[in-house]
């Protein structure tokens, strides 16, 4: 009887990456539905893996929350140069990017509490968001200013804080409310030709 041939390292690594990506996608969806305090078993069930697989990849809830948001932050940041290259105008690129940023913000049930928690694993999450997304927004604003589509004095940090404040949700708000308010803010920034 022959010994089974072990899978090549590359195959195992690719499978591990697919599992990790599936867990991140499942966690992201569960966090939208239930918030960041959702039971790990719900995430495992949605990902089609065991709870042990989650803990093997993400030993603490903070590790999982950080990985999910890091992935989403990186995706949002990478969208900026892509939109500049593909959009009819820099302001169109900014508008689409801001829509993606708003979607990121309004689906983060419990993120505010997580950012304010004493968990040392979450302490750098807000800084990560700013360090990654402010430069992406600045790139778009600079292109808009160069095309004379916005005033050159608009700070990316200030615009993002204003958007963030408009996206604070409560029992009387819906996602559409945040989108309408942010659209009004952007309309005020726009300098039509």
Predicted regions and their residues:
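Amphipathic alpha-helical packing segments from all-alpha helical-bundle domains
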Residues: 74, 107, 114, 121-172, ...
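Short hydrophobic/aromatic patch on the recognition helix
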Residues: 48-58
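Basic, helix-initiating cap at the start of DNA-binding domains
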Residues: 1-46, 63-66
